[in-house]
């Protein structure tokens, strides 16, 4: 199973709130405070994937939003190359050939760029089987939990290195390498734990009648 998703990283704020305790008189010292972005939020979209065997690539979307054409590039650069590292491609073929229909499944949600006709045709041509995915179900995708931890680690790395980009161009110039390094640091132990939570996730969604769950 290959899990994938896009996510937006917003600079100038953490991905989630945290409760912290400061010593008396230290609460408002500059080194204990997170700054805000004065010129408006800076956002970067990234795409990534993983399987139960490997952490896949992380791709930074320079153009901002992802449309069908950009997603085709992501599939070619990210998914096809990742699958070829996991499975042995058929000799003499530049497509992913699968010996059995159930050798693997590729998961992406129902975003318009994922379901566009040209994308569907590309996946069929490459013989990449796609998992049917229920609408509005981020709680069933374990990569969503990984995104939260990844964003926290990325923000921490920026603070540690004293990097404070003031524009999107600066983020793309200075942070691409850091983004990819932080993603690679997400260990297989954590990913395996998230994947093993799938039976509980499915049971929770069924028990909730398709409604909200803790995931």
For each predicted feature, which ranges?
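Short, aromatic/basic amphipathic alpha-helical patches
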Residues: 116-126
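Acidic/histidine-rich, metal-coordinating catalytic segments
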Residues: 4-6, 89-114, 140-141
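Extended, low-complexity cationic-aromatic segments
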Residues: 1-80, 209
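Acidic, Ser/Thr-rich intrinsically disordered and amphipathic helical segments
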Residues: 45, 50, 70, 74, ...
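A long, amphipathic alpha-helix that forms part
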Residues: 65-102
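RNase H-like polynucleotidyl transferase catalytic core
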Residues: 106-110, 124-145, 161-163
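C-terminal anion-handling pockets and recognition modules
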Residues: 1, 8, 143-215
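Generic structural signal for small/hydrophobic residues in well-ordered secondary structure
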Residues: 5, 48-50, 75, 109, ...
């Amino acid at each position: 199973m290959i899990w994938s998703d896009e996510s937006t990283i917003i600079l100038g704020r953490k991905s989630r709130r945290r409760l912290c305790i400061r010593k008396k008189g230290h609460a408002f010292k500059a080194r204990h405070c997170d700054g805000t972005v004065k010129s408006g939020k800076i956002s970067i979209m990234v795409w990534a994937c993983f399987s139960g065997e490997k952490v896949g690539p992380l791709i930074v979307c320079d153009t901002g939003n992802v449309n069908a054409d950009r997603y085709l590039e992501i599939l070619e650069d990210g998914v096809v190359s990742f699958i070829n590292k996991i499975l042995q491609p058929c000799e003499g073929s530049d497509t992913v050939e699968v010996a059995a229909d159930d050798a693997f499944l590729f998961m992406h949600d129902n975003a318009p760029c994922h379901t566009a006709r040209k994308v569907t045709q590309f996946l069929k041509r490459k013989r990449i089987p796609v998992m049917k995915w229920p609408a509005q179900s981020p709680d069933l995708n374990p990569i969503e939990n990984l995104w939260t931890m990844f964003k926290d680690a990325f923000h921490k790395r920026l603070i540690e290195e004293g990097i404070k980009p003031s524009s999107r161009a600066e983020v793309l110039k200075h942070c691409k390498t850091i983004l990819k390094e932080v993603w690679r640091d997400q260990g297989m132990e954590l990913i395996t734990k998230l994947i093993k939570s799938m039976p509980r996730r499915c049971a929770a969604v069924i028990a909730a009648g398709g409604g909200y769950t803790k995931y």
